[in-house]
UniProtKB/Swiss-Prot annotation:
The disulfide bond which can form in the large chain dimeric partners within the hexadecamer appears to be associated with oxidative stress and protein turnover. Keywords: Acetylation, Calvin cycle, Carbon dioxide fixation, Chloroplast, Disulfide bond, Lyase, Magnesium, Metal-binding, Methylation, Monooxygenase, Oxidoreductase, Photorespiration, Photosynthesis, Plastid. The keyword Disulfide bond applies. It is found in: Plastid, Chloroplast. PANTHER family: RIBULOSE BISPHOSPHATE CARBOXYLASE, RIBULOSE BISPHOSPHATE CARBOXYLASE LARGE CHAIN. It comes from the Eukaryota. HAMAP family: RuBisCO_L_type1. The modification N-acetylproline is found at P3. InterPro entries: RuBisCO, RuBisCo_large_chain_AS, RuBisCO_lsu_C, RuBisCO_lsu_C_sf, RuBisCO_lsu_fd_N, RuBisCO_lsu_N_sf, RuBisCO_lsuI. The gene is rbcL. This is Ribulose bisphosphate carboxylase large chain. The basic functional RuBisCO is composed of a large chain homodimer in a 'head-to-tail' conformation. In form I RuBisCO this homodimer is arranged in a barrel-like tetramer with the small subunits forming a tetrameric 'cap' on each end of the 'barrel'. The lineage of its organism: Eukaryota, Viridiplantae, Streptophyta, Embryophyta, Tracheophyta.
């Protein structure tokens, strides 16, 4: 099929094209603790053997090119090349294979997710010999993890800053996401925070548009935060989206947020880019700001089962680049998210050490060597009837975010927020008493309705709303 290179200068230069597998398929290779390991789902073109396809991925994402070049003799390819060291068929699909590739750590710049992805998921994804290619998982070695700052603060520091423990946090995305004036936007934030939510949020595409410039929004939202805090005695926050067209403008917005004294800012990390995200994360740690991350554009990359990159890889990359929250799907809402897969990458976000578990899509054991964790955010098509399931699935270290499920309440924003707070506290109390939320959830919510008119009204309006018509695209 395609190229390859001799690995030792002593062999001498011999021009021509060789099969990749002659050099890059090494089933005898024993992986090192310092290697970055990748699991690719490979769909070769007809007639291309899986060994050649896996070797091609290893070559084109590391040191290889389409033909032998004389400059190979000026370095040690054995030291720097990627190696396809194991291939296994995908059960139920004879045309697909999981190819495992090991990359020497020296191929990557320290502390740069940008450089890591440029190599591993760069040009190789357009390679003609492959019909499709998907990066399913990465093992990041501790030696490389330690070159990253990671989240600005992490789960425990955030709880200490907010003085909130023993329950999930509650949020709300302000709707309509576009079109409100800054003052009306701030009013909606205030009503939600006063009603019992911990956070309100800019939607991902709220930046600085003609109908609402960023500085005006920041000021009115800060006013809403301080007024709600004074009335409730609780610390409140609003995710002020600092995403901008340049890194300089992004940091300017974060600086203004800090000057206002608010606790948290936000970034769209995929559309904004990993370099921008890491820059903002470093600023947030240095200046005491929490950082909420939205994953806008992720489904372009991760939704197709045979091509792209799984979200668990994007989640690991975010933990390295830096963020205190990230949207992770809901399992029960309107957006894509199969339960076991979601729980797999939720653990990768929060826990310090995660064992290999193929039943949840985790291909490698991952040791984060005490890097702070990231709080998963469940958001998208959820309402009070989902509260028992969300509490059971995500546990305490999560943010449950109800946009339409707050602002769509028949009595208004503050009653909508109150309904969510009552439902959450009822579920947490029931769980702490040993009740089974999965089995008794509806009864728990109905019982709470007896002493909360706001919750009763919310339950009535959304009693028929479900999003289980469509099956998840990405399954194990």
């Amino acid at each position: 099929m395609s190229p390859q290179t001799e690995t030792k200068a002593s062999v001498g230069f011999k021009a021509g094209v060789k099969d990749y597998k002659l050099t890059y398929y090494t089933p005898e290779y024993e992986t090192k603790d310092t290697d970055i390991l990748a699991a690719f789902r490979v769909t070769p073109q007809l007639g291309v053997p899986p060994e050649e396809a896996g070797a091609a991925v290893a070559a084109e994402s590391s040191t290889g090119t389409w033909t032998t070049v004389w400059t190979d003799g000026l370095t040690s390819l054995d030291r720097y090349k990627g190696r396809c060291y194991h291939i296994e068929p995908v059960p139920g699909d004879p045309d697909q294979y999981i190819c495992y590739v090991a990359y020497p750590l020296d191929l990557f710049e320290e502390g740069s997710v940008t450089n890591m992805f440029t190599s591993i998921v760069g040009n190789v994804f357009g390679f003609k010999a492959l019909r499709a290619l998907r990066l399913e998982d990465l093992r990041i070695p501790p030696a490389y993890v330690k070159t990253f700052q990671g989240p600005p603060h992490g789960i425990q520091v955030e709880r200490d800053k907010l003085n909130k423990y023993g329950r999930p946090l509650l949020g709300c995305t302000i709707k309509p996401k576009l079109g409100l004036s800054a003052k009306n936007y701030g009013r909606a934030c205030y009503e939600c925070l006063r009603g019992g939510l911990d956070f309100t949020k800019d939607d991902e595409n709220v930046n600085s548009q003609p109908f609402m410039r960023w500085r005006d929004r920041f000021v009115f939202c800060a006013e809403a935060i301080y007024k709600a805090q004074a009335e409730t005695g609780e610390i409140k926050g609003h995710y002020l989206n600092a995403t901008a067209g340049t890194c300089e403008e992004m940091i300017k917005r974060a600086v203004f947020a800090k000057e206002l004294g608010v606790p948290i800012v936000m970034h769209d990390y995929l559309t904004g880019g990993f370099t921008a995200n890491t820059t903002l994360s470093h600023y947030c740690r240095d200046n005491g700001l929490l950082l909420h991350i939205h994953r806008a554009m992720h489904a372009v990359i991760d939704r197709q089962k045979n091509h792209g990159m799984h979200f668990r890889v994007l989640a690991k990359a975010l933990r390295m680049s830096g963020g205190d929250h990230i949207h992770s799907g809901t399992v029960v809402g309107k957006l894509e998210g199969e339960r076991e897969i979601t729980l797999g990458f939720v653990d990768l976000l929060r826990d310090d050490f995660i064992e290999k578990d193929r039943s949840r899509g985790i291909f490698f054991t991952q040791d984060w060597v005490s890097m702070p964790g990231v709080i998963p955010v469940a958001s998208g098509g959820i309402h009070v009837w989902h509260m028992p399931a969300l509490t059971e699935i995500f546990g305490d270290d999560s943010v449950l975010q109800f946009g339409g499920g707050t602002l769509g309440h028949p009595w208004g924003n503050a009653p909508g927020a109150a309904a969510n707070r009552v439902a959450l506290e009822a579920c947490v109390q029931a769980r702490n008493e040993g009740r089974d939320l999965a089995r008794e959830g509806n009864e728990i919510i109905k019982a709470a309705c007896k002493w909360s008119a706001e919750l009763a009204a919310a339950c009535e309006i959304w009693k028929e709303i479900k999003f289980d018509t469509f099956k998840a695209m990405d399954t194990l």
